[in-house]
Regions:
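Sec-dependent bacterial lipoprotein signal peptides
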Residues: 1-20
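Hydrophobic alpha-helical segments and their boundary regions
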Residues: 5-6, 113, 203
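A generic structural signal for short, solvent-exposed coil/turn residues
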Residues: 7-10, 32, 92, 173
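A structural "domain/chain start" motif
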Residues: 18-121, 228-232
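Surface-exposed short loop/turn segments
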Residues: 21-24, 91-187
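Short secondary-structure boundary motifs at beta->alpha junctions and helix caps
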Residues: 57-73, 163-231
Length: 232
């Protein structure tokens, strides 16, 4: 258990800032100060901004699932959401505020670490656990609209299930990040789930870059979704 715990802790540190072990400096966002005027009403459960390893037991359904802390990136997810919304919606100049009901990120390394433990291939925690290992095929970010009630139903003891994925979404069972965004912008509330596998063309992907991809998709959903036909 001590070895597994050490593996997860080092992995957690590695994943806190990046998804695929970049060697380059993290990206910057020129002009982000222009959106400082956008007030962020943070209505998230306090726990969503905190780091957590859900289980160290290999037999647990929550094994190797990790919640990423807000301070893992600069800017934070909600701050980057406000900036991209400011760029996307000129109307925010007249209504300079957004409500963030959920913005939370999970790392799911369950299949990867179970395989490693079972086969006894613990050849170094960072090498074995980083998302984006060369042994996994690259894919694309997958974003879908969800009913925000899904997040309420999975709070508490079921929170780890938010990091699950289907075989169709991730047939190779690669380590992934799963990012949930639930925000009200210009009076319209939209919730989304974004699955980030090792990304094609991005061998060195920072977590904040994954945020940016998911936010772009979320804002596209915001434009296209009619509240009357939103997911139930």
């Amino acid at each position: 258990v001590h070895l597994i715990k050490s593996l997860l802790v080092v992995t957690a540190v590695a994943l806190s800032g990046c998804t695929t072990a970049p060697t380059l400096p993290p990206p910057t966002f020129p002009g982000i100060e222009q959106s400082n005027k956008i007030a962020i009403e943070d209505l998230r459960p306090a726990s969503e901004s905190e780091k957590k390893i859900f289980s160290l037991m290999v037999s647990s359904d929550a094994y190797a699932i990790y919640r990423v802390a807000d301070n893992a990136t600069d800017p934070t997810g909600p701050r980057l959401l406000a900036h991209r919304a400011y760029e996307a919606f000129p109307q925010l100049a007249e209504q300079p505020s957004i409500k963030v009901l959920h913005f939370v990120t999970y790392a799911n390394m369950q299949s990867h670490l179970r395989r490693s433990v079972t086969q006894g291939l613990l050849i170094g925690p960072v090498g074995m656990a980083l998302v984006g290992s060369p042994s996994y095929p690259s894919s694309e970010v997958l974003t879908s609209a969800i009913n925000s009630e899904q997040l309420e139903r999975t709070a508490g003891d079921q929170e780890h299930t938010r990091a699950y994925f289907t075989e169709q979404e991730n047939p190779s069972k690669s380590p992934v990040n799963v990012i949930y965004i639930d925000a009200e912008i210009l009076g319209k509330r939209v919730a989304s789930r974004c699955l980030v596998p090792p990304v094609t063309g991005k061998p060195n992907l920072f977590l904040v870059e994954a945020f940016d991809m998911c936010i772009a998709n979320h804002l596209a959903l915001h434009r296209s979704i009619n509240p009357a036909t939103a997911p139930q």
